[in-house]
Amino acid sequence: MKVMSTVPAVSMRRLDSGQYIIDFGQNMAGWVRMNVRGNAGDTIRLKFAERLNADGTLYLKNFRDALSEDIYVCNGSENGRPWRPTFVTHGFRYAMVSGMKSPKAEDFTAEVVYDDMATTGSITTSIIF
C-alpha cells in the first residue's frame, strides 16, 4: 500500500458532546494524518465512518462489534508534530476526533492509499450505471 493522494478536510464541526466531526468530502481507503498537540497523558481518538446519522453523528451500525478507531497518547512534546497510524487502513469519508486541544480542520489530512501497480488498461462504455 502506498499513499497515492491526500485530501484536506472539507469541513469540521463541533458536536454538543465536545467531539468534532471532520468531513473529507469523499469516501476513500486510507487513514488520517494529524498534527498532534496535547499535554502528557492526553488521549486523542479518531473514529471513522462512511456516512452520518440524521443527527450528524457517525453512523457505526455497519461495524457491528468491530472497532474502527485510532488512539494516540500524547507525551506532551508533540507541538503540532504530524502523526499517522501504521498497520491499518480505514474505509471512510468522516472522522470524529476527541481528546485533542483546540483542533482545527487544517490539522487533519486524509491520505488515500492503494496498491502501487502500473495501470495496464482501461475500459469505456456507453452504459451508465
Whereabouts are the PLM-identified features?
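Extracellular/oxidizing-compartment recognition motifs
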Residues: 1-129
